[in-house]
Amino acid sequence: MVDIIIAEHAGFCFGVKRAVKLAEESLKESQGKVYTLGPIIHNPQEVNRLKNLGVFPSQGEEFKEGDTVIIRSHGIPPEKEEALRKKGLKVIDATCPYVKAVHEAVCQLTREGYFVVLVGEKNHPEVIGTLGYLRACNGKGIVVETLEDIGEALKHERVGIVAQTTQNEEFFKEVVGEIALWVKEVKVINTICNATSLRQESVKKLAPEVDVMIIIGGKNSGNTRRLYYISKELNPNTYHIETAEELQPEWFRGVKRVGISAGASTPDWIIEQVKSRIQEICEGQLVSS
């Protein structure tokens, strides 16, 4: 009998739960259509579930006065939010409060005279939104995705460093350490979300203790990809999937212990589907042997 262990911290975080709840509640209160500006969270299956309820992801082409638009959990630049309100749309801000804290941090550092380094993925919606707030408070800064990106920061005497909320803690520390070697004054505001840290620590603990590790989450989810990379370093038999349909029977041949973790945008119902499918695969292999 296979032992399936779900990581202590896995799946929906506070910010994602809040965004999904706001989307569901908006359906009861809206007179017009309900949209999200882009996918509300990075999980295609949950986005599709909300779409079936009547919450449609959009880039804004079909918005009409009186419609409801929900700002995604990752946030958007302030100028975009202002443009939505000017169109006569009802705007519901589902930006994660922890992401809002990053917006406040970059403006605080700007007011204090620091050049801002944002450790994150350059094309991630959260980073794009945060850069919008940095512009709005007349700040200057760069995004650091790899250590090769820090060059511009080293030209400044005072550097303030923040992180995308779902950033890898080890890489964040590495960037801080490298910049501190070369810059006269460094101020660090650790804006990595506690939920991200807990999920990463849970994976570090579980991955070495199992034969196979399954990481569930959207392929476009930065925090899920980081869980996968962390797990893969500790357990080569790590696989990143979105749904139970992607599970391959050969992954589980001769396996006794399977670990499961999931990104912050992965709902419980998908985790349960994956767990059930693994049980079916392993029981089928026992019968055939």
From Swiss-Prot:
Binding site for isopentenyl diphosphate: H42, H74, H124, S221, N223, S265
Cofactor: [4Fe-4S] cluster
Temperature curve summary: Optimum temperature is 60 degrees Celsius.
pH dependence per the entry: Optimum pH is 7.0-7.5.
Top-level EC class as recorded in UniProt: oxidoreductase
UniProt keyword terms in alphabetical order: 4Fe-4S, Iron, Iron-sulfur, Isoprene biosynthesis, Metal-binding, Oxidoreductase
Active site: E126 (proton donor)
Catalytically driven reaction(s): isopentenyl diphosphate + 2 oxidized [2Fe-2S]-[ferredoxin] + H2O = (2E)-4-hydroxy-3-methylbut-2-enyl diphosphate + 2 reduced [2Fe-2S]-[ferredoxin] + 2 H(+); dimethylallyl diphosphate + 2 oxidized [2Fe-2S]-[ferredoxin] + H2O = (2E)-4-hydroxy-3-methylbut-2-enyl diphosphate + 2 reduced [2Fe-2S]-[ferredoxin] + 2 H(+)
GO molecular function, one term: metal ion binding
Family designation: Belongs to the IspH family.
The protein's name in its UniProt record: 4-hydroxy-3-methylbut-2-enyl diphosphate reductase
Organism: Aquifex aeolicus (strain VF5)
Record lineage: Bacteria, Pseudomonadati, Aquificota, Aquificia, Aquificales
